[in-house]
Amino acid sequence: EAHEELMQHIAGVALQEKDTFIEDIDRDSEAYDSVFACFKMPKATDEEKAARSAAIQEATKFAALVPMQVARNAYELMTVIMDVARLGNRNAVTDACVAMMSARSAVLGALMNVRINLGSLKDKEFVAKLQAEACELERLACAKEKELLDEINEELKV
């Protein structure tokens, strides 16, 4: 009851995030379609080959950036989930833990999609930057999940 206003705000934020994640499904599909379309570009001449290659590279960069944003958003949601677990109804704390595990899975799944796209990019600086961010985001997400689960498991000990 003491944190009811905050929980109402968090519920609104969660609904907005749900809508964002649904929009990201479409963005990811569009990014894949764009890469696929680039592979269908003509490649009969050297100029066509160069244009096709450049288009594939740009489309693949975008295809890596879409799931990276999903991973960032899912990680931010983990902070919200932590607040809910700590301040919300104690009878629902295990639900918050399941939400945390799901958010961590969303982070890691999105990062796998980032990495598969990075593997075919020639822009090594771009690849290194996103790979470093992906590694850090994975570390942070796993640590945040562990922090909450350890905390709640300790509380639940009989």
Task: Give residue spans per PLM region.
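Conserved, well-structured ligand/cofactor-binding cores
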Residues: 1-158
